[in-house]
Regions:
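Active-site SXXK
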Residues: 32, 44-72, 167, 248
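Acidic helix-start/capping segments at beta-turn-to-alpha-helix junctions
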Residues: 69-84, 120-121, 146, 191
Length: 286
């Protein structure tokens, strides 16, 4: 069995090989063990910041201000650059709030992110995170119409920043049914479990990527949200299996690797290697 000190040493050695900065925060919900390395340091949060937008949406739903079944009309002026598929659709069209949230997380759709951040309010989202004790989380832009012009020439933290500790604590609340309500947490976890990009935290793990389609209950399951742009890569999520259930966040920045964001990259490999080391230790594969 890998003891905490040995695991920390192993993860530290892996992180030391990176050309930039690496931050790790992992919380074993089965044993109570934590592993933290540079966990309070602020990193570009990129699209992982969308978890906080989803959280505030569910708080608003719980308060009765919004219903997941409400319809919103997406207009041409709402379309945003970057990741997602909605910008390719003919406008105007109607869609439910739940489906907007689903696309924001599952395919990281920026148009849907704009709609929900505008609906919830950027300042409200940040204030909610502060109320939860997440002080490094900061959504700096709501993806308004001028966002990409405003970010031109700036570093990627102009959009969003967070610490690995804050992300792990946020996902822990979701995983334990403590964010908003048990029902809301379950719905958020279900959405995260549909994320189509599992190849960073899940890169070296024995995951079945299409269990529903194959009709096979997954032995190991990842519920996550990643982010990528320029020199930054990050991934945060819950990993479950027969022997453990844990939350893990790995954030990287300032790499010298110039590769495009969803291609093979030093940051995504680093996330995968650290994830595998923690998986082996906490799932008993050592």
């Amino acid at each position: 069995m890998v003891v905490a000190a040995d695991l920390r040493s192993e993860v530290g050695k892996i992180a030391a090989e990176f050309t930039g900065r690496v931050s790790v925060s992992a919380n074993n919900l089965t044993t109570g063990e934590r592993l933290d390395i540079r966990e309070s340091e602020v990193f570009p949060a990129l699209s992982a910041i969308k978890l906080g937008i989803m959280a505030e949406l569910f708080y608003r739903v719980d308060a009765g201000d919004i219903a997941l079944t409400d319809k919103v009309t997406i207009k041409k002026s709402d379309l945003r650059l970057g990741t997602g598929v909605v910008r390719e659709f003919e406008t105007p069209f109607e869609i439910t709030v739940k489906d907007v949230c689903m696309m924001m997380i599952v395919v990281s759709d920026n148009t849907c992110t704009w709609l929900l951040s505008d609906m919830a309010g950027k300042d409200n989202i940040n204030a909610r995170m502060r109320s939860l004790g997440l002080h490094e989380y900061s959504l700096n832009s709501d993806l308004g119409a001028d966002t990409f012009d405003e970010m031109a020439g700036k570093d990627i933290d102009a959009y969003s920043v967070c610490s690995s500790r804050d992300f792990t604590n946020l996902v822990t609340r979701i995983a334990t049914g403590e964010l908003v309500s048990e029902s809301a947490s379950a719905q958020m976890l279900d959405i995260m479990g549909r994320c189509q990009h599992i190849e960073w935290l899940g890169r070296y793990l024995p995951l079945n990527q299409f269990p529903t389609e194959m009709g096979v209950p997954p032995t190991y399951k990842l519920h996550n949200k990643l982010g990528a742009y320029l020199h930054g890569r990050c991934d945060t999520g819950l990993i479950t299996g027969p022997d453990a259930r844990y939350v893990i966040t790995v954030m990287t920045a300032d790499t010298t690797d110039p590769t495009l964001m969803l291609c093979e990259h030093e940051g995504s490999r680093m996330i995968g290697r650290i994830s595998k080391a923690i998986f082996d230790a906490w799932m008993g594969f050592d």
